[in-house]
Amino acid sequence: MASHSDTLVVFFGATAGANGGKLGSDERELILLVWQIVDLHENKVGKLHRTLVQPDSVDLSEQCKEETGLTAEELCKAEPLESVLQQFHQSVSAELKSLGRSSYTLCVDGPLLIRQVLHPEASKKNLVLPECFYTFVDLKKEFHKCCPNAGPVKDLTLLSMLDYVCIQATVEQEAGLREVKDMVLLILHVLADPYNHKFSAFETVNYKFESGACSKTEAVDSETVIRARGLPWQSSDQDIARFFKGLNIAKGGVALCLNAQGRRNGEALVRFINSEHRDMALDRHKHHMGSRYIEVYKATGEEFLKIAGGTSNEVAQFLSKENQMIIRMRGLPFTATPQDVLGFLGPECPVTDGTEGLLFVKYPDGRPTGDAFVLFACEEYAQNALKKHKQILGKRYIELFRSTAAEVQQVLNRYMSTPLISTLPPPPPPMVSVPVLATPPFITTGNTRDCIRLRGLPYTAAIEDILEFMGEHTIDIKPHGVHMVLNQQGRPSGDAFIQMKSADRAFMVAQKCHKKMMKDRYVEVFQCSTEEMSFVLMGGTLNRSGLSPPPCKLPCLSPPTYAAFPAAPAMLPTEAALYQPPLLATPRTPQAPTHSPAPAFAYYSPQLYMNMNMSYTTYYPSPPVSPSTVSYFAAPPGSVAAAVAAQPTPAILPPQPGALVRMQGLPYNAGVKDILSFFQGYQLQADSVLVLYNWSGQRSGEALVTFPSEKAARRAVAECSNIPLSGHPIHLACCE
């Protein structure tokens, strides 16, 4: 398309649904196109053309029937969009040739027809639009240049512009014809004295989305950013750009959000070139990507930079190569070298610049994480690489996914940043009982009611479901502030605690989300304090009777041995969490337990340690630990040291009778009953078995079993080791 044009083609369209200012907001198809040529040199007009378009669905809205006068019968006889666009191109080209002109530009009454209707519909139908549909003149903006006092561009209409210059609107019965005639009158008017206007400011539609890096220091206008929610997990930045086809996304302006496991959570932040395009993007709320509808909301520049921004020179250099396909590799052996990766990919998918096109993700201390990003020069090479998904390198299968520049930044930011708390400290020996603090070390207890409790969650609910349930309030969650409560079998209990940024935010969530539905269940939401949350996370209960203290023992590791629990302060019943403090009645004080005296310290259950390490940081990728790591130790050493320091004299621990046997290689569906059957004849009880879970809350294939004596444990290891359970040979070992 030339930088200037000999002619304008005045272009008008209508859909089967909303028209006017809401054109394209309901995803309805084009049913009518009207056009007419205007010679800018001779101030002459060509023939007026009107063509019906057959949609895939001829269901017309009442507004459409009233405004256009069209019927389903007429549309069934029309040609489909692809044929009509070919007719349009041939007709305009022939007419231009007869006029002796060489180029033309579309002229429309606002950008909606081109950006919100034609490009999205052509994209969904896999139609290739002619080049002329990527450049156009917006008559409203051109008129505003001539008549700036006519009002803001967004408030201008065809009739208001005609009224401003005192032109009588065309009297025409057929819809489309009158609009085109009125637009032609306006164009001829501004071409003449006193305006003598030159049409030179052309709007453009991007041919494709350009990926790129974004710096944390870059200024991002919040009026240009949206959040898209409900995306298919496998969608890429190109898929999102296609969903917003017709709107111009800034370079590197798609940032896919990741969950705590480093997987896409169905959300993305998208940055457009200006606020006008952002506003049109908001009108695509609940439009469809395939069979899924996508929610579109306003977002901020700060949120975008949190996901897409990066400062690493290594990342900037890696992403400096433009128009590259990015593939993420996950699960690499920690000893893998660049040559190993290049050999795995093979000659059929050459990496851009060889080893320079590889970026290994590492921890701050230089240890590899098992992730890497790879650059490919074209789509063909990227597709060949994706065919190697779950093939073996060394002894591990490798996952390959499409990735984006923003995802590279996210993952590197996460791994290279210093964690707020150590995620996996070296554990103490499992046979040694350790005194710990009476509160979780990661939570500062207090009476400030800046937490919420979710009760009645579906047992299949994951952290992503909770974040979706909270909606817009997700941004008010503290880092590492989501705590899933598991029962003593390591299964979800239906409860979760969430730490909010303030008591006001917690109160707001409790008010708005209480008894809101999640899947097929309603969920109760109560405001509470960190003190109440700590009691429950340690094994206590928070119910209609108020708080009950946690049992002071290590479950499943030894026969019951209780320690005294000091009298707790006044506790609030759960229902009180919905009300502000002035409305609360005086709470009652629970009675202290009457067990035999013992040192004043408590034990963490394995449940607590798992809960604390399943915390979630919004949009962060996988936690810096191996997914197969088993979390069954009583407490992290930090809390151990603090507890020991707090003791005036060395604590005397109650004796731990029995001996512990570790089982490895269990089927993932094996439960306590299966393990008891495996050790039939050893007179074990259900509470002697502890099934271990990994960081994802799934069974790890291991268990700990307490035998009444060391002799019985050694006999079980000798007799039962390598005996199959459901086809899996079980390895047994005594824990010394």
Swiss-Prot record:
GO cellular component terms attached to this protein's record: nucleoplasm; nucleus; ribonucleoprotein complex
List, alphabetically, the InterPro entries matched.
ESRP, Nucleotide-bd_a/b_plait_sf, RBD_domain_sf, RNaseH-like_sf, RNaseH_sf, RRM_dom
Q: Name one GO molecular function term.
A: mRNA binding
Q: Which family does it belong to?
A: Belongs to the ESRP family.
Q: Which PROSITE patterns match?
A: RRM (PS50102)
Q: Where, per UniProt, does this protein localize?
A: Nucleus
Q: What's this protein's name?
A: Epithelial splicing regulatory protein 2
Q: Explain the purpose of this protein.
A: mRNA splicing factor that regulates the formation of epithelial cell-specific isoforms. Specifically regulates the expression of FGFR2-IIIb, an epithelial cell-specific isoform of fgfr2. Acts by directly binding specific sequences in mRNAs. Binds the GU-rich sequence motifs in the ISE/ISS-3, a cis-element regulatory region present in the mRNA of fgfr2.
Taxonomic lineage of the native organism? Eukaryota, Metazoa, Chordata, Craniata, Vertebrata
> Pfam families of this UniProt entry?
RRM_1
What keywords would UniProt list here? Answer: mRNA processing, mRNA splicing, Nucleus, Repeat, RNA-binding
Biological process, per Gene Ontology: cranial skeletal system development; hard palate morphogenesis; mRNA processing; regulation of RNA splicing; RNA splicing
Q: Which segments constitute the RRM domain?
A: 224-301, 325-405, 659-736
The cross-references to Gene3D superfamilies, in alphabetical order and at most eight, read: 3.30.70.330, Ribonuclease H-like superfamily/Ribonuclease H (3.30.420.10)
Q: Does the keyword Repeat apply?
A: yes
Q: Electron transport among the record's keywords? A: no
